[in-house]
């Protein structure tokens, strides 16, 4: 059955839930495309709830998809230069079109604020959602994430969408 979702701006009391969504998305959905070492290194990079408050205070914009109880189940984080740094879905709320709606909301905001393009680094898992929203994959990015005493190789995709 279809649940009703509302896209709304971030509120301060969302921070803890967003940190949970991020951790769950990486650890639950990540293994479908990435190795255990890659997933562990990716998850360890993210410092938790406080960081959302700092980023919003610094001018980043977050839109959340909230369920009928107004609890966030997905979100997008947009920086003022058009860079989308986060696009994450709670594992129980994937394949509902939320990523597409969040990216459309980010694009509307970006146009209104004079940004000329949106761009992101998309995981293998997120790339189809970006492409459905009109982004083009420009290149594959191979890099490493330091984790414990080693560097874990991983990759993602540069994607972008002109807004003009």
Model-derived features: positions:
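Short, Lys/Arg-enriched N-terminal segments with co-localized hydrophobic residues
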Residues: 1-2
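Acetyl-CoA-dependent GNAT
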Residues: 5, 9-12, 20-92, 103-105, ...
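Conserved G/P- and acidic residue-centered "switch" motifs that form tight phosphate/ATP-binding loops
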Residues: 97
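Conserved GNAT acetyl-CoA-binding A-motif
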Residues: 110-123
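Conserved active-site tyrosine of GNAT-family acetyltransferases
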Residues: 130-131, 135
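Exposed loop/turn and edge beta-strand positions of beta-sandwich/beta-sheet ligand-binding modules
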Residues: 59, 83, 116, 153-155
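Conserved catalytic-core motifs of GNAT/GCN5-like acyltransferases
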Residues: 119-121, 136-158
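Conserved short alpha-helix immediately C-terminal to the canonical SAM/SAH-binding motif I
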Residues: 102, 126-129
């Amino acid at each position: 059955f279809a649940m009703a979702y509302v896209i709304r701006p971030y509120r301060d009391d969302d921070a803890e839930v967003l940190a949970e969504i991020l951790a769950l998305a990486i650890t639950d959905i990540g293994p479908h495309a990435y190795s255990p070492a890659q997933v562990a290194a990716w998850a360890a990079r993210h410092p938790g709830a406080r960081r959302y408050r700092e980023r919003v205070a610094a001018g980043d914009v977050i839109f959340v998809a909230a369920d009928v109880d107004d609890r966030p189940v997905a979100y997008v984080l947009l920086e003022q230069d058009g860079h989308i740094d986060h696009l994450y879905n709670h594992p129980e709320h994937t394949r509902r079109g939320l990523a597409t709606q969040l990216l459309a909301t980010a694009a509307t905001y970006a146009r209104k604020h004079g940004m000329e393009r949106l761009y992101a680094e998309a995981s293998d898992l997120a790339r189809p959602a970006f492409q459905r929203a009109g982004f083009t994959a420009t290149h594959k990015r191979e890099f490493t994430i330091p984790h414990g005493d080693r560097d874990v190789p991983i990759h993602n995709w540069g994607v972008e969408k002109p807004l003009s």
